[in-house]
């Protein structure tokens, strides 16, 4: 029995300054474009821009 395709998908957020990644979910209907968030990067030890990758 197949399940219905939901609106929430799992995405990876990759740091623009190092290779660190976060994994999170986003709502496909509310955010159809790629996300860009400022989050803490433990490698460079400061807040940097993270971009959504496939």
Swiss-Prot record:
Gene3D superfamilies: Ribosomal protein L33. It comes from the Bacteria. One of its GO terms (molecular function) is structural constituent of ribosome. One of its GO terms (cellular component) is cytosolic large ribosomal subunit. GO terms for biological process: translation. Keywords: Ribonucleoprotein, Ribosomal protein. Pfam families: Ribosomal_L33. Belongs to the bacterial ribosomal protein bL33 family. HAMAP family: Ribosomal_bL33 (MF_00294). This is Large ribosomal subunit protein bL33. It comes from Chloroflexus aggregans (strain MD-66 / DSM 9485). The lineage of its organism: Bacteria, Bacillati, Chloroflexota, Chloroflexia, Chloroflexales.
């Amino acid at each position: 029995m197949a399940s219905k395709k939901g609106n929430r998908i799992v995405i990876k957020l990759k740091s623009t300054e190092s290779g660190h990644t976060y994994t999170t979910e986003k709502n496909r209907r509310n955010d159809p474009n790629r996300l860009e968030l400022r989050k803490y990067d433990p490698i460079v030890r400061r807040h940097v821009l993270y971009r959504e990758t496939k």
